[in-house]
UniProtKB/Swiss-Prot annotation:
Induction: Induced in high iron conditions. This is Hyphally regulated cell wall protein 3. The keyword Secreted applies. Its main location: secreted. Residues 1-20 form the signal peptide. Residues 383-729, 883-1217 are annotated as: Disordered. The GPI-anchor is attached to the protein in the endoplasmic reticulum and serves to target the protein to the cell surface. There, the glucosamine-inositol phospholipid moiety is cleaved off and the GPI-modified mannoprotein is covalently attached via its lipidless GPI glycan remnant to the 1,6-beta-glucan of the outer cell wall layer. Belongs to the HYR1/IFF family. It comes from the Eukaryota. GO terms for cellular component: cell surface; extracellular region; fungal-type cell wall; side of membrane. A lipid is attached at residue 1225 (GPI-anchor amidated asparagine).
């Protein structure tokens, strides 16, 4: 079994190697071929072009070496390409060019290459028409691209490009370009390459679960390209370049946001665009410089994509400037033209043996072209050589001449004159060969090629010519009946054979289509049609007429002496009837000699008839004697040397354009046939030509065994190279002698630029390298157009006044050429006040404010405000240097409704929280407040509340009130009433004494509700800060959170723990107050404990603290003993302080401050009762008022922003902000705040209380 396998494997290797195809030189195959066996290798420098092969199935490895090319193409609209490789064991390696091109087809194409591995280091092109969806699959387990891959369609369809094995991986380090195509990702993508979408292409990431390397790049190169990514839970970030100008980025679900996340968002710091579909999202790194104003949600409904309504984001602005990665800079090239897909033609030479056993060499043109359906056919036209004995054949090749003003003449000259260069073979596409015998009396050969417009007009002007008797013709009549005229017709395309204007104008005066050779007949009618040329052989000595544009020819000038062997007939177009005309105008011979090796067409010998009156027969005896030689001579095809060409055309405007369109030759028995062309208007040139003809022309005498013809041959040079040469050879039997070798056209290559008119009528400019050989131009290389990119940039412009302005816009760059597409309108500059943070050198962060100017995305700081002056509580001199006066008291816990400040010059409205003042002038003097500021308890709370917690109240109550039960009620109610400074004593007062309630209520407003808020502020500062020094009360309020957070969490434990846990928590006022109230006074036990602790330490007398078991006893005991005098107050204070907290009892001043804070100010006495401190227990009213103010919370601070209006002198807007800081004077006296002056210094306002 193993032996069998080895044998089978060996046989397979032998068969594979045997069937392997190795391309070592350029090869073109058209039509059906089979390549389904063996390995295909294209060597470097070679190419294989397969054209119109419907199915190309590879069954082995494909290896294209560097510099090699494999081209498979279709030129038929009915034929689609099917290119497959279905071997799972073979590979594709491309280091050169692989091109699969069926753009001409109207049917669907199928490119399905499946192998073990795919490696592309060169260029690979997959092209289709897109009329129907096509398949483009490059599938391999190992897939690597380091070069260029182009997927192209003429128009977009639902067909897609698939790369790699599904769920596998591809490595792209090169460039993948899309034209009207969709790339559908089904694999992991690795590498640092680029995928570029051009001309309405799309990139579809259909399986976003498979990772895409963060080094892979996606480039949207035009405004119609897009990118779609599957919306899945695994979010990736894709590098996208070129996003803008209306192209799209999206996901496969509608873009919908879930608050707080919007449907899409752009991070200006990272340049990442996030597109969301609910909880699913994908991110795209589009770069910096985008403005949110230009983003919009759109629908991408392109062919080949899942149509998701409102699933994409478009950016209508230009693409911000961003450097492309190197892989995206690899140029996307157009699909190359396969060799052999353009119609072509070439000349070939065939050597055969004739019936006589002699070799016969034939030359012809091979034309390869297509029909209307794109199918190829080949036409070969053979030109017979002139092998005669006594008879002669003339091959008349008719084709329209090349449209060049430098059309070569029929006679190459050794001088290298451009007018004497041979023409080229591109004038022929097909041929018909016809032989028409001619008789002596008529000219019967016809040419199918129509002459140029100039020739037509010339034939019309000379449409009738009658040749009268000539002695030369009479004597030559013996041989005329044996001649034949062979006309070979070549139909060529109009584009390649139209004569140029220079050639047309040069033959207008000649009878371009008429060639009249005097025959043995007395009269010869001349062809009237431009499409006919008479090639009538005669026995005259080489009656080959020279064509001349000479308008006048005198007989004496044209009758210069010439020998019998040099006689030529000169006919001028100036006459419609010709008599004996033997004037020799030129020694240049005209014969049926092709003007080059690749073209069988000769100079048209147009007989311009000379007026009879100017050319008398008596002056032409030479031609008569020449008839004696007519029986032995043949039409020879001699090319004159430089000395023989004295009558060469003097300019490119000679009648040479007719030499390619019509050929008429009159083989004669003379030993020489010559034709001269001249564009001169005087006969002096004819004289000089006649002189040279008598000395410089060598005649060839033909014999029955000798023939001359033009042929092409190859020569191996000394270096081994093969070159092709053409010339005239003489054959005598089996002997060949080269008479003349044509000078090859000088070939030059150079770079040039030309314009091309496209099918839509637009004109495009192309550049490349062309090769010029004579008047033939061949395009060798067409430069790929410069890649055009558009980007946003900024430039400077010098204005007419010499100033320099900066502008921005979108420019288009093609190579080194820059074109401005859009110039952005300059950004509107605005100035406003703002606040920002600055990181100092030590790492700390400071906040600054000022005026900034914004122009687009550029910010400029105009003014930086100096930081505010902060005044401490008792610094009465603070602010005096800046002219501050009496402050305003604000309260954020109890907002003032519609509070207005009135200026002397304007009215400003302050919002309810007193947070800002608008349209203020630089200095504000506020005269009045429409809503007065309450003074009950305000200000007092900051000092009083700190010492005056739940214990403080119980002591105060027991000492303050004269009635029984005062203490017990005071304790229970004191706890629930907590927090709000100026409403604090409402419940306290009502239960504090028999007379207290009525006064207390009227002074304080509401009852229990006030107490609930009171606790949080009241007790917060009481614990931690209470009792350490005289400043304890005031600091208690200010240190505990600026009033708002003052005492948070303190109230709840205020009654029971009374100071030890006081101020430990944090929280809002309402929660603290409510908790404080419920714990502090909700039960008799709470009150009794409160009383007992207070009582036991409160006084120095006997039984002061014994009433600890019940509220009533405790209160009554406290009341009777405590309320006797001022000593009681001081004892109360000291006792109060000691129980008020672990930190509060160290100083007896704590109690005294508590007393003084409760009513020592005369200002406060006017509202709440005078003499409150020293006469604390003597008056019920005084006690009641004391209760109402007792425990006032700390006044919260408020922030006041001031924005002055533009001043008349500066024209700018400044702004300021200030901190309203609570304050009392050193003696605890509350400042009166009815008038506020806001002074602005360095754009900053400072206000203190």
């Amino acid at each position: 079994m193993h032996l069998f396998k080895r044998i089978a494997l060996t046989l397979w290797l032998i068969i594979s190697s045997t069937l392997a195809v190795v391309i070592t030189e350029d090869r073109v195959d058209r039509g059906t071929i089979s390549v389904n066996l063996g390995e295909v290798t294209v060597n470097s420098g070679a190419s294989w072009s397969i054209i119109n092969n419907a199915v190309t199935a590879f069954a082995g490895k494909i290896n294209v070496q560097s510099g090699g090319g494999l081209y498979i193409s279709s030129t038929s609209p009915l034929l689609a390409l099917q290119v497959t490789l279905t071997s799972l064991l073979d590979s594709i390696t491309n280091d050169g060019v692989i091109s699969l091109d069926s753009r001409a087809s109207l049917t669907a194409s199928n490119y399905n290459l499946i192998g073990l591995s795919f490696t592309n280091n060169g260029e690979m092109y997959l092209a289709a028409s897109g009329v129907l969806p096509s398949t483009m699959d490059l599938t391999a387990a190992s897939w690597t691209n380091n070069g260029l891959i182009v997927a192209y369609q003429n128009q977009r369809s639902s067909g897609v490009l698939n790369l790699g094995t599904p769920l596998g991986a591809i490595t792209n380090n090169g460039q993948i370009c899309l034209y009207n195509q969709v790339y559908q990702q089904q694999t992991r993508i690795e590498g640092s390459g680029c995928i570029t979408a051009n001309k309405n292409s799309a990139i579809y990431i259909s399986n976003a679960v498979l990772p895409v390397a963060t080094t892979q790049n996606f480039y949207l190169q035009d405004s119609k390209s897009s990118m779609i990514v599957q919306a899945v839970s695994s979010t990736q970030t894709f590098n996208v370049y070129g996003f803008g100008n209306g192209n799209k980025i999206g996901i496969t679900l509608p873009a919908v946001g879930i608050p707080p996340n919007p449907a899409y968002s752009y991070d200006v710091d990272t340049g990442i665009l996030t597109v969301r579909a609910g909880l699913l999202s994908q991110k795209f790194n589009i770069g910096l410089g985008y403005y949110s104003l230009f983003f919009s949600v759109v629908t991408d409904n392109g062919a080949g994509l899942p149509s998701t309504i409102l699933g994409s984001i478009s950016y209508s602005g230009p693409v911000p400037s961003r450097n492309l990665p190197a892989s995206c800079k690899i140029a996307c090239k157009p699909v190359p033209t396969a060799p052999g897909t353009n119609p072509t033609e070439y000349t070939t030479t065939i050597t055969t043996t004739n019936s006589a056993g002699n070799p016969l060499t034939e030359t012809g043109v091979v034309d390869i072209s297509t029909d209307s359906n794109g199918s190829w056919f080949t036409t070969t036209s053979i030109f017979p050589t002139t092998s005669q004995s006594s008879s002669s054949e003339t091959v008349a090749s008719s084709s329209q001449p090349d449209s060049s003003s430098t059309e070569p003449s029929a006679f190459p000259s050794s001088t290298g004159d451009s007018s004497a260069e041979p023409s080229i073979t591109s004038d022929y596409s097909s041929s018909e060969l016809s032989v028409v015998p001619s008789s002596a009396s008529e000219s019967a050969s016809e040419s199918s090629a129509e002459p140029s417009s100039a020739s037509e007009s010339a034939s019309e002007s000379g449409s009738e010519s009658v040749a009268s008797e000539t002695s030369a013709s009479e004597s030559a009549s013996e041989q005329s009946s044996t001649s034949e005229s062979v006309s070979s017709e070549f139909a060529s395309s109009d584009s390649s054979s139209e004569p140029s204007s220079a050639s047309e104008s040069s033959v207008e005066s000649s009878s371009a289509s008429e060639f009249v050779v005097p025959s043995s007949a007395t009269e010869t009618s001349v062809s009237e049609s431009a499409s006919e040329s008479s090639a009538e052989p005669s026995s005259a000595s080489e009656s080959v007429a020279s064509e001349s544009a000479v308008s006048e020819t005198s007989a004496s000038e044209s009758a210069a002496p010439s020998s019998a062997s040099e006689t030529s007939v000169s006919e001028s177009a100036a006459s419609s009837s010709a008599s004996e005309s033997f004037a020799s105008e030129s020694s240049v011979e005209s014969s049926a000699v092709p003007s080059s090796a690749s073209e069988f067409s000769t100079s048209e010998s147009v007989a311009s008839e000379t007026p009879a009156s100017e050319t008398p027969a008596s002056e032409t005896p030479a031609s008569e004697s020449a008839s004696e030689q007519s029986s032995t001579s043949e039409s020879s095809a001699e090319i004159s040397s430089a000395s023989e060409s004295s009558a060469e055309p003097s300019s490119a405007k000679s009648a040479i354009s007719e030499s390619a369109s019509e050929f008429s030759a009159a083989p004669s028995s003379a030993s020489q046939s010559s034709a001269s062309q001249s564009s001169t208007n005087e006969s002096s040139s004819q004289q000089s030509s006649a002189e040279s003809s008598s000395t410089g022309t060598s005649s060839v005498s033909a014999s029955a065994a000798t023939s001359e013809y033009t042929a092409t041959w190859t020569t191996t040079n000394s270096d081994g190279s093969v070159s092709t040469e053409s010339g005239i050879i003489s054959q005598s039997g089996s002997s060949f002698t080269t008479i003349t070798t044509f000078v090859p056209d000088a070939t030059s290559e150079y770079t040039t630029t030309w314009t091309t008119t496209n099918s839509d009528g637009s004109v495009s400019t192309e550049s490349g390298i062309v090769s010029q050989s004579g008047s033939s131009f061949t395009t060798i290389t067409t430069f790929a157009p410069d890649a055009t990119s558009e980007y946003t940039t900024t430039w400077t412009t010098t204005n007419s006044d010499g100033s320099v302005s900066t502008e921005s816009g979108v420019v288009s760059q093609s190579g080194t050429s820059l074109t401005t597409i859009t110039t952005f309108a300059p950004d509107v500059t605005s100035e406003y006040t703002t606040t920002w943070t600055t990181t100092n050198s030590d790492g700390s962060v400071s906040t600054e404010s000022g005026i900034v100017s914004q122009s687009g995305s550029s910010f400029t700081t105009i003014t930086t405000f100096e930081p505010p002056v902060v005044c401490k509580r008792d610094d009465v001199n603070c602010g005096s240097s800046i002219g501050l006066s009496t402050p305003y008291y604000g309260n954020s816990s109890q907002p003032l409704s519609s509070t207005k400040m009135t200026d002397t010059s304007a009215t400003q409205t302050v919002d309810s929280s007193l947070s800002s003042i608008t349209d203020a002038t630089t200095t504000q003097s506020v005269n009045s407040l429409e809503t007065p500021v309450p003074t009950s308890g305000s200000g007092n709370g900051s000092n009083n509340g700190s010492d005056n917690g739940s214990n403080n109240g119980s002591n105060n109550g027991s000492n303050n009130g004269s009635g029984s039960g005062n203490g017990s009620n005071n304790g229970s109610n004191n706890g629930s009433g907590s927090g709000n400074g100026f409403n604090n004593g409402s419940d306290n007062g009502s239960n504090n004494g028999s007379g207290n309630a009525s006064n207390n209520g009227s002074a304080s407003g509401s009852g229990s509700d006030n107490g609930s808020d009171n606790g949080s502020d009241n007790g917060s500062d009481n614990g931690s800060n209470n009792g350490s020094n005289t400043d304890n009360g005031s600091n208690s309020g200010s240190d505990s959170g600026n009033g708002i957070d003052n005492g948070s969490g303190n109230g709840s434990s205020d009654g029971s723990d009374n100071g030890t846990t006081n101020g430990s928590g944090s929280g809002g006022e309402s929660n603290n107050g409510s908790g404080n109230g419920s714990d502090n006074g909700s039960s008799p036990d709470n009150g009794s404990n409160n009383g007992s602790n207070n009582g036991s330490n409160n006084g120095s007398g006997d039984g002061i603290g014994t009433g600890s078991n019940s509220d009533t006893d405790n209160g009554s005991g406290n009341g009777s003993n405590n309320g006797s005098g001022s000593v009681n107050g001081s004892a109360n204070g000291s006792g109060n302080g000691s129980n008020n907290g672990s930190n509060s009892g160290s100083n007896s001043d704590n109690g005294s401050n508590n007393s003084s804070g409760n009513g020592s100010s005369s200002d406060l006495g006017s509202v709440s009762g005078t003499g409150n401190g020293s006469n604390e227990g003597s008056s019920n009213e005084s006690g009641a008022n004391n209760g109402s103010n007792n425990g006032a919370g700390a006044l919260p601070a408020a922030t006041l922003s001031v924005v002055p209006s533009p001043s008349a002198d500066s024209g700018s807007t400044s702004s300021a902000s200030a901190m309203v800081i609570p304050n009392t004077n050193g003696s605890g006296k509350l400042l009166n705040g009815k008038v506020l002056t806001l002074s602005v210094l360095s754009s900053m306002v400072v206000v203190f209380l």
